[in-house]
Each structure stands twice: as structure tokens, then as C-alpha cells.
């Protein structure tokens, strides 16, 4: 094993082992698909991501919402489903402030039009554009409106479901969900349930002032839900180039672009941008910023040239993708990524940085883009880090790692590495400091 302060490996000078093609964990041949149900119109399809979300069908008994509202619009099981929502909601209060509240049954909305605006603010805690009571699912066909949700203290959320499924067919490029608060807030939140999005083309931003835990998309599911409908995953079909998710904390830790607290994250294709940025300089808190996080597995299809996952922190630990349990290595969680034409970046001022890290195995397809990790403190940095096996297709892009005082490894596989480095591929590790070491490949 080579070790030096700076180690650079070019594919033109090295022939690695034969490439290993990476695939998706849940292939169409192995995964049941329920999209063949006969319905008048289906507003969302998640093509066999391992779980198909609730489908939304148009019917003739829907009620439209237009005009202006300065109080919460409550819906119950006895009310008609909503058709097109084009209203403006201006609702302010001190706690549990909502634009639309699904109190029973299923909150079904055909479309939230582009001229719909949710201005919901709390002078203390708990502000929601759309919210439900316990056991109520949310089913939205198309979302094109604007959500401006704020709380002076904690828990501002654009859309929250307290049921088993929060399903949105299409979030259009006109859609905007803007969240501001000072602690624990979310763009879209499935509490004790699953979050399904067919197409993500809009913009979601969550900005916290002094506190912790900003999440763009969040599923907090059932810890015991290991089989069956899996009410704990985040599933996205197509993440378009116009789509973006940003989760930022000005002074706190816990920034997450997409997080499944107990389940999986599955994305068919990524052409948009996912960013997690933590302004915390607290060196006692690990896992400060993560672009995509899942307790179980992460399955990410191909990343186009415009696709990116970025995690940055002024404090401890930044990961572009992280699969596993934050408290240790009790889980064997895997990451599968298709071809990478875009960029995966992680930057930490004090703690560990890794483009992608799994507590199990990590598989990546061909790499023509960039995967990088850097730690400016005396901490480790890894381009790709697998506690077990690491496999890649042909690398014709760049995979790099840099640290100011510890170990840097571009490719790290605890149980071995299988890769092919193409003629234009660059595998680079840079480590500065007397005790620092750099490895292009380390196993």
C-alpha cells in the first residue's frame, strides 16, 4: 500500500480490475408494481421503486378553493375531496397555525395551482401550510403553488402528514416551499409514514437561524416496519434539473437535504441539486451536514451532468450521502448509485468528510463527473467510503480526498475494492501535516 502526503493515480497509467456494473436494489423484475389499477387519471407513478405510493384519480365530486382565507380551512372525512386550490391563505397565530388541516379521512387535493399562496406564520411554534391529524393520509396530484411558512421558534413545515402516506404526483418547476424558523423545521414531512413524490421539479428551502435540524424532505417512520408497505421511506421518481432542495442552519447542526430516519431513500434519477449546509462550529456534535441520509439503504439512479449532492459544515462531519445509524455501526446499510455525471461534494471544517459513506457495501456505476471530500481540520476525508465492499464501474472523472492533518483516501473499502480506472480518470488523495497520510485506494 502506497502512502505519501500527496498521491495521484491516473487511469492512463493503471489498468484496474474488470469493471463491475452497478444496479438498483429493487429491479422491476423483482419488485411488484401496482400501477395497473384502472383509474380515470393517475397523477403519480413511481416506477417500481420498491413501493408505489398512493395514486390519485380525478373524479367529479371535488370542491375547488379560491379567494382569500385568513383562518384555517379544516377538512373532514364527510367533506368532498378538493379539486383545484388556487386560494391565498394568510394565517397567523401563536401555535398550531395551519393553512389547510385534514382532520379525518384522507386529505385529497387534485392540484395546488400556481397562483395558490400559503402565507402561514407562528409567533411561537408549529406553523404548517398543510397539516393533518393522526391517521390522515395526504394525496396531492400536482403542486405548483407557493408556501411561505415561518415560526419564531420551532417547527415550521410546508406540508406534513400524520398518516401512513404522503403522496405528491408532481412538484412543478413553478412550485416554491420556503421555510424559516429557529429550530427543527422541514419542507415536506411524513410523520410515522412514507413520502412518495413522482416528479420533483420545484424548489424547497429550509433556513434556520440559531437552532438545529433543518430538513428538506423528511420521513420519520415506524422502527418496526421492516416488511409490508414500508411506511418510513422516501421515494422520488424523477428529480428534474429545475428541482432543488436546500437545508441550511446558520448556527446549528443537523442540516439534511433528504432524510429517512428509519427507512430507505430511493431516487430513480437525479438531475437537480440537493444541498445541506450547517453553520455550526460545534466540534462536539457529529453528523453536522448530510445531503441524503437513510438508516437503511440508499438507492440513487443515474446522476446527470446537472445533478449534484453537496454537504458543507463549519463544524463536525459532512457527508454527501450517508447510509447507516449515526450512533454506531449496528446496521449494515448499503448505498447503490448509478452512473455519476454530476458532482458529489462534502466539506467539513473540523470533522470527517466523505462524498458517500455506507456502514455496509457501496456500489457506484461509471463516473464521468466529480466526487470529492475535504476536511480542513485534523480529521479523515474519503471520496467513497464503504465499511464493507466498494465497487465501481469505469472511472473517467475525478474522485478525490483531502485532509489537513489525518488520513485521506479517495477510495476506501473495508472488505475490498473492485474498480476500473479509465484513461481520463483521476484518483487523488492529498494529506498535509507531519502525521497525515494519503491513499488513492485503501482497503
Regions found by a protein language model. Give the residues of each.
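Gram-negative bacterial Sec-dependent N-terminal signal peptides
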Residues: 1-57
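Surface-exposed loop/turn motifs in large extracellular/passenger domains
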Residues: 58-443
Amino acid at each position: 500500500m502506497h502512502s505519501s502526503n500527496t498521491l495521484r493515480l491516473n487511469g492512463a497509467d493503471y489498468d484496474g480490475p474488470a469493471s463491475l456494473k452497478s444496479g438498483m436494489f429493487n429491479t422491476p423484475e423483482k419488485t411488484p408494481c401496482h400501477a395497473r389499477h384502472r383509474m380515470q387519471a393517475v397523477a403519480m407513478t413511481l416506477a417500481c421503486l420498491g413501493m408505489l405510493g398512493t395514486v390519485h384519480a380525478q373524479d367529479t365530486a371535488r370542491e375547488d378553493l379560491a379567494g382569500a382565507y385568513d383562518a384555517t380551512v379544516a377538512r373532514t372525512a364527510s367533506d368532498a375531496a378538493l379539486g383545484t386550490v388556487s386560494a391565498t391563505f394568510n394565517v397567523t397565530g401563536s401555535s398550531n397555525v395551519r393553512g389547510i388541516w385534514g382532520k379525518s379521512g384522507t386529505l385529497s387535493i387534485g392540484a395546488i395551482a400556481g397562483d395558490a399562496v400559503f402565507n402561514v406564520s407562528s409567533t411561537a411554534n408549529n406553523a404548517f401550510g398543510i397539516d393533518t391529524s393522526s391517521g390522515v393520509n395526504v394525496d396531492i396530484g400536482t403542486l405548483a403553488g407557493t408556501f411561505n411558512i415561518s415560526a419564531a421558534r420551532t417547527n415550521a413545515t410546508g406540508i406534513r402528514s400524520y398518516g401512513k402516506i404522503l403522496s405528491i404526483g408532481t412538484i412543478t418547476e413553478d412550485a416554491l416551499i420556503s421555510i424559516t424558523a429557529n429550530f427543527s423545521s422541514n419542507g415536506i414531512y411524513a410523520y410515522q409514514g412514507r413520502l412518495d413524490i413522482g416528479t420533483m421539479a420545484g424548489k424547497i428551502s429550509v433556513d434556520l437561524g440559531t437552532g438545529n435540524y433543518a430538513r428538506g424532505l423528511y420521513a420519520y417512520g415506524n422502527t418496526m416496519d421492516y416488511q409490508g408497505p414500508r411506511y418510513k421511506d422516501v421515494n422520488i421518481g424523477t428529480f428534474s434539473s429545475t428541482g432543488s432542495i436546500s437545508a441550511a442552519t446558520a448556527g446549528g447542526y443537523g442540516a439534511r437535504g433528504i432524510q429517512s430516519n428509519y427507512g430507505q431513500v430511493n431516487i430513480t434519477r437525479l438531475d437537480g441539486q440537493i444541498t445541506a449546509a450547517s453553520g455550526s462550529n460545534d466540534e462536539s456534535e457529529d453528523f453536522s451536514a448530510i445531503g441524503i441520509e437513510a438508516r437503511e439503504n440508499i438507492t440513487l439512479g443515474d446522476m446527470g451532468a446537472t445533478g449534484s449532492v453537496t454537504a458543507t459544515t463549519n463544524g463536525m462531519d459532512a457527508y454527501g450521502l450517508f447510509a447507516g445509524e449515526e450512533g454506531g455501526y449496528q446496521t449494515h446499510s448499503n448505498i447503490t448509485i448509478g452512473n455519476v455525471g454530476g458532482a458529489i461534494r462534502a466539506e467539513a471544517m473540523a470533522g470527517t468528510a466523505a462524498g458517500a459513506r455506507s456502514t455496509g457495501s457501496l456500489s457506484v456505476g461509471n463516473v464521468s463527473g466529480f466526487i470529492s471530500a475535504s476536511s480542513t481540520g485534523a480529521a479523515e476525508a474519503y471520496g467513497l467510503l464503504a465499511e464493507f465492499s466498494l465497487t465501481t464501474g469505469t472511472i473517467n472523472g475525478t474522485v478525490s480526498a483531502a485532509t489537513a492533518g489525518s488520513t485521506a483516501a479517495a477510495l476506501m473499502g473495508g472488505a475490498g475494492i473492485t474498480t476500473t480506472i479509465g484513461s481520463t480518470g483521476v484518483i487523488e488523495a492529498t494529506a498535509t501535516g507531519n502525521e497525515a497520510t494519503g491513499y488513492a485506494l485503501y482497503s
